[in-house]
A protein has these predicted regions:
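Generic structural signal for well-ordered, non-transmembrane alpha-helical segments
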Residues: 37, 41, 137-140, 300-303, ...
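N-terminal-proximal low-complexity accessory segments that begin disordered
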Residues: 1-49
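Alpha-helix capping/hinge segments and adjacent helical runs
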Residues: 362-477
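Extended amphipathic alpha-helical segments enriched in small hydrophobics
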Residues: 293-351
């Protein structure tokens, strides 16, 4: 079956047996662990909406490769329409889950590999593109989720990969057999790795002579022997485990560190091996695609944040306060700016030799620069409207306590006629969207650091053209 339902997605994850740890203990049942399940549910929304009549036509399409219906999260864009659909899907999902749905990064890897493997083959006569296409068809036919395994631990940032005192600071090949390559290292910030069927590895930086062992791209199942998922902490990570004060009662985000401890990668899953000069292209293509994805996703999250702010105005009796309305207008403007930049990046896309369409990198990076600033400002405005109880609202357990619960509810009342429970729930949701570190930090660093976004814009811009405009107007030859 080419398109899975949500239940089929859960069933497919249950068949996997990943090695995973959290809070110092081994996780034996990933799917039913409440902390991980909230993240799995977020990815599961990409499957759920594929069968929802409202979103079905947007999220599903016919694969030009398998000729079967597929989820768009398995399709490298083959047209401008596909590029635009990526942004619209991500916005819809951002509002639907109110956090990261985690599936865009795997698609960004597929997009990248569909371009760069072709380019490598053209130069060296290798067969990476054919290998990748076999993998892509496997992903499409089974509606698999991929995790983008890109960011290395990096060690001493002033040194290149091969110069590191500890050679494992960047993922590298440490052996070869007739079956494949053996790799060792670690990748960090692995959003949704346990929600994924496949781990797709790309280089994290440009490389040069001496870095050949680090110039790798490949894909392996998420439960491959030697692959260890260590779930990271974030500021609200015990709420789901405790079963109270979750705020977002359905979805959340988690980000493991992924350790590759002598992992065997079959040759048919290797998509780049020691071609150092193509590491930079891998990074730049992935980064651009991912920054385009963010513009859709985060505009959708701001939609949910704006809704929360508006409801707090209703529940607190401030719906007619003019300066609150001004803040809401600012939030709407922020969402549309991110969305508009990502749509523009899509409409300005161009077809690559492999047939995949690539977005305009300047506009994609412009969207990400806005996101880094505007998401923080949107959070500030939402909290400004909501008030101080975002920081210190008593626990759900206090409200249910027979001795103090009714007293608390009495003093938490807001607008006349509004049940106090609505106000409490909305305050808790706002706390979640404002203060969950796994999400708020990615608004700044997701897809690369803010400095990287700015440098990319300068590097990709036609500086000489801009100078020529000014020279002509000033009469300078």
């Amino acid at each position: 079956m080419a398109i899975k339902t949500f239940e089929e997605y859960l069933k497919s994850l249950r068949k996997l047996k990943p090695t995973a740890y959290m809070f110092g203990e081994r996780i034996e049942n990933v799917v039913d662990n409440p902390r991980i399940r909230a993240g799995i549910n977020a990815t599961g929304a990409t499957y759920e909406l594929a069968s929802n009549e409202k979103y079905k036509d947007l999220i599903t399409t016919i694969s030009p490769f398998t000729k079967e219906p597929i989820n768009r999260f398995t399709l490298p864009p083959q047209s401008i329409e596909d590029l635009v659909a990526r942004v619209k899907i991500n916005r819809a999902l951002g509002g639907y889950v109110g956090t990261c749905h985690q599936r865009c990064t795997g698609l960004d890897c597929l997009c990248t590999l569909s371009i760069v493997t072709y380019d490598i083959d053209k130069k060296y006569g290798t067969h990476y593109y054919d290998r990748f296409m076999d993998f892509l068809k496997h992903v499409q036919k089974n509606d698999l989720t991929g995790n983008a395994s890109v960011t290395d631990v990096k060690g001493d940032r002033s040194l290149s990969p091969h110069e590191q005192p500890d050679k494992d600071m960047y993922l590298r090949v440490v052996g070869q057999t007739k079956e494949g390559i053996i790799v060792r290292g670690a990748k960090v910030h692995q959003t949704g790795s346990l929600s994924s069927h496949e781990i797709i590895v790309l280089p994290t930086r440009a490389m040069g002579k001496g870095d050949e062992d680090y110039a790798l791209a490949f894909a392996i199942p998420s439960d491959t022997e030697g692959l260890i998922h260590v779930v990271g902490r974030n500021s609200m990570d015990t709420r789901e485990i405790e079963g109270v004060d979750c705020g977002n009662i359905r979805y959340s985000k988690y980000c493991p560190t992924l350790i590759f401890d002598e992992v065997l990668v079959p040759w048919d899953r290797v998509f780049m091996f020691r071609e150092v000069e193509f590491a930079a292209e891998m990074v730049s293509r992935f980064s651009a695609f991912h920054r385009q994805s963010h513009g859709g996703c985060k505009s959708g999250k701001i939609d949910a944040m704006t809704g929360a702010a508006l409801l707090m105005m209703d529940y607190s009796g401030t719906a007619k306060v003019s300066h609150h309305k001004e803040k809401v207008i600012d939030m709407i403007h922020m969402a549309e700016t991110l969305y508009g930049c990502s749509l523009a990046a899509s409409y300005e896309g161009k077809k690559e030799p492999s047939g995949t369409y690539f977005i305009d990198p300047i506009l994609a990076n412009a969207s990400k620069i806005h996101e880094g600033k505007e998401m923080a400002e949107a959070v500030r405005l939402m909290v400004d409207i909501a008030g101080g109880y975002v920081a210190d609202l008593p626990s759900d357990r206090d409200f249910e306590n027979p001795e103090i619960g009714e007293l608390l509810k009495k003093y938490l009342k807001g607008a006349t006629g509004v049940p106090v429970e609505k106000r409490i729930k909305m305050l808790r949701l706002i706390e979640k969207m404002a203060m969950e570190s796994a999400d708020t930090i990615s608004d700044i660093h997701g897809g690369g650091s803010p400095a990287a976004h700015r440098l990319t814009i300068f590097r990709e811009s036609d500086i000489n053209y801009k100078k020529s405009c000014a020279k002509r107007l000033a009469g300078i030859e």
